[in-house]
Amino acid sequence: MFVPNHLHLLVKGYITNPPKSETVLNQWFKELVNKVGMVVVAGPTSVYVNELGNEGITGTVTLATSHASIHVWDAIHPSMFQFDLYSCSEFTPDQVLNHINEHFNLQSATWQFIDRNDMEFKLIDSGKWVAEH
């Protein structure tokens, strides 16, 4: 019997080149999905919120029995972001962190990688990512 993965990556961090448009963020999602071998069923969809004190962009993509989302607050520097990816496909935190870094210049991040296959969540790995200077 096939038992799919239930992997969930949660990341909080800071970037110095935040996405400034919905088009840029949607393209980033398309490239990420391709890198980790998932199938898009809806989206990506992104929207910029221009609410004082909460300025930033939010994007989501619905994947086959999975999802990815990111929220970037760009009024501060470096910009803070929160990201999560839930997938039944195999992927690694490094794949995602490198993709964030390539596009948005990741400065620092903390992350947790969780196995949600059983009723009890299991922490697979966690760590910190710091830019090399």
Which residue stretches match the model-derived regions?
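Polybasic/polar functional segments that serve as interface/processing modules
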Residues: 1-133
